[in-house]
From Swiss-Prot:
It comes from the Bacteria. Belongs to the metallo-dependent hydrolases superfamily. Adenine deaminase family. One of its GO terms (biological process) is adenine catabolic process. It catalyses: adenine + H2O + H(+) = hypoxanthine + NH4(+). The gene is ade. One of its GO terms (molecular function) is adenine deaminase activity. SUPFAM superfamilies: Composite domain of metallo-dependent hydrolases, Metallo-dependent hydrolases. Disulfide bonds: none annotated. The lineage of its organism: Bacteria, Pseudomonadati, Pseudomonadota, Alphaproteobacteria, Rhodobacterales. This is Adenine deaminase.
């Protein structure tokens, strides 16, 4: 199936005018509901919405003049009629699903518009992979806009990727029909220091009249932040506290507050609106990263809106942050984000504005979900063989590949350790004294919960393995977890307490072509196969979610108590978020953007 383009307002304006005037019948009327008007922040009972050609023709107390013998009537029975929800920043690949299966998972939760940055697949398959994601996105019955990835690699010189994105790639992508802008500009030091490549990508986007996505993962809100904003990024989702949110909107950016599977950054920032009283127009809700189990079991943007309301936000303001604010940011407020004439007929019916049960979802004028069940097909792209079989280790790994040699004669060593922080993307730079046995540094039964982490190169079959230490997972016994989802270079991350288990896990992923696996005492406890680029599955969302849930349970069985620890695991190689990360080139201190030694001399 080929990508399709939705007819423009101008294309169908004659029909909309005729329906609104009562000269022609509507295709559908939603009758007698409470109209949530996000333009005026009002709840207006006793209204009806008339729809034609997939767009809204009329909204008013009585739409009977728009009705004809073939008009479909949907009785709202006083329920709230709210705009379809928009996710302002997200990565489809984090759901472990292709765009089609991701859409099928989130449509029943009321998401009808997504702004997605496929920079995960860009690191593995380059521009060709981005085009595949873009094309499948355009095939869906809801609105999926693609942001062209900006940073592959995310930090040049500190990691290697399967492919690199160039300014020429960005300029080419700006001509594609579904490209809405530039994906998050993660190389914030590059922008601050006026790196010609980064500024060229931003310039190509701005000259195309499109939006530049931001990513400023630094606590420094002084001149470095000012320089970043001056470079052109228009939004940022990396804030973690109220001061971050306020600084961004004061400088003319949109503050995107995220609630993903493991990122809980709404509660700490939304006080800028609920307590400080800042104008909410420049605040947007998003998910960033949600894995499939969260999507299927907990929800998507409806979950984020509910959470914002639970944090004290007025329900109508929370809805604005997930509809009109998002659409306006991307220059689409005349196209979507509200239930007003001319806009795409993306409408949700719900009986409660706080708990937000999603009872009926209409997208582009057709019923796409009802009572939690998808009601339309989400067409699949024919993924080529080049998108599969992307795990190339060079040789089968053994326990020896994961050994860390101690300095000659040492009985103990001091190590730099990556410290995981629950529910947040940043890590802590920790230090730990570790024992040495037979010349090798050991972590077994360490009182500070230190275990081993390895970054296994998988794009060029170099056989390279970078070893380091991580703390915070709470793993116990002889176990290992391996994943080819390893933001953003997407090599393979292996975390474990035992080198033999680490080798078993890594080799298993090479065997199945990518995914996530957990091993204990020589047995595989869970496996999520992700054959497309080692990032996604084209299996049904419910099947992938069940395997993802089994993965979460297996991590808990191995002693992990972190909320959605898989997401923490997948970000340990993201060398643009402080403080410590691992890459195929070594241990990276993101505060200084330098490689540092794993081991230090004992005082």
């Amino acid at each position: 199936m080929e990508p399709t383009t939705f007819p423009s307002w101008a294309d169908v304006a004659p029909r909309l005018v005729a329906v609104a005037a009562g000269r022609e019948p509507a295709d559908m009327i939603i009758r007698n509901g409470t109209w949530i008007n996000v333009h005026t922040r009002e709840a207006l009972p006793g209204h009806s919405i008339a729809i034609a050609e997939g767009r809204i023709a009329f909204v008013g107390p009585d739409a009977s003049h728009c009705s004809g013998p073939d008009t479909r009537i949907i009785e709202a029975n006083g329920r709230y009629m709210i705009p379809g929800l928009c996710d302002g920043h997200m990565h489809i690949e984090s759901g472990m699903l292709t765009p089609a299966e991701f859409a099928a998972a989130v449509i029943p939760h009321g998401t009808t518009t997504m702004f997605t940055d496929p920079h995960e697949i860009a690191n593995v398959l380059g521009l060709a992979g981005v085009r595949m994601m873009h094309d499948e996105a355009l095939m869906q019955p809801v609105n999926i806009f693609t942001q062209m990835p900006s940073c592959a690699p995310s930090a040049p010189g500190l990691e290697t990727t399967g492919y690199e994105i160039t300014p020429e790639d960005v300029a080419e992508a700006m001509t594609w029909p579904g490209i809405i802008g530039l994906g998050e500009m993660m190389n914030f030091p590059g922008v601050t220091n006026a790196d010609p490549k980064m500024l060229a990508e931003i310039a190509a986007t701005q000259r195309a009249g499109k939006t530049v996505g931001g990513h400023y993962a630094s606590p420094d809100l002084g001149p470095a932040f000012a320089a970043y904003v001056a470079g052109g990024p228009a939004d940022d989702h990396e804030g973690t506290c109220e001061a971050d949110a306020i600084a961004r909107v004061r400088q003319g950016m949109r503050s995107m507050m995220r609630l993903g599977s493991a990122w809980y950054d709404v509660e700490t920032q939304i006080t800028a609106v609920t307590e400080k009283g800042l104008d909410p127009r420049n605040f947007i809700l998003c998910t960033d990263d949600c894995h499939s189990a969260t999507l299927v079991n907990d929800g998507h943007m409806n979950r984020v809106v509910r959470h914002a309301i639970a944090c004290g936000c007025d329900p109508l303001i929370a809805l604005q942050m997930a509809t009109i604010n998002t659409a306006t940011h991307f220059g689409l407020e005349r196209e979507l984000g509200s239930t007003a004439p001319g806009r795409r007929a993306d409408v949700i019916l719900t009986s409660d504005l706080r708990d937000l049960p999603i009872e009926l979802v209409i997208a582009r004028g057709q019923v796409v979900a009802e009572n939690g069940k998808i009601a339309v097909d989400c067409p699949h792209y024919d993924w080529p063989d080049t998108a599969r079989g992307t795990v190339h280790l060079g040789h089968a790994l053994s326990a020896r590949d994961f050994e860390i040699a101690a300095p000659t004669g040492a009985n103990r060593v001091r190590a730099n350790v990556i410290g995981v922080v629950e529910n947040q993307a940043p890590t802590k730079a920790l230090k730990a004294e570790l024992p040495v046995r037979e010349g090798l540094v050991e972590t077994a039964e360490h009182p500070d919960d230190v275990c081993q982490i390895a970054l296994v190169e998988r794009h060029r079959a170099t056989g390279g393995v970078t070893n380091a230490f991580v703390s915070g997972f709470g793993y116990q016994g002889r176990m290992a977890m391996a994943s080819t989802v390893a933001h953003d270079s997407h090599h393979m991350i292996v975390v474990g307490t035992d080198r033999e288990q680490m080798a078993l896990a890594a080799n298993r992923l090479a065997e199945v072509g990518g995914g996530i696996t957990i091993w204990r005492d020589g047995q595989e406890l869970a496996l999520v196969e992700l054959p497309i680029a080692g990032l996604m599955s084209d299996s049904p969302a419910a099947e992938v979610a069940a395997k993802a849930q089994a993965m979460v349970e297996a991590m808990a069985a191995c002693g992990c108590t972190l909320n959605n620890a898989y997401m923490q695991h997948s970000l340990l190689a993201l060398v643009v978020i402080p403080e410590l990360r691992i890459s195929d080139l070594g241990l990276i201190d993101v505060r200084s953007f330098e490689r540092i030694d794993l081991l230090e001399p004992l005082a």
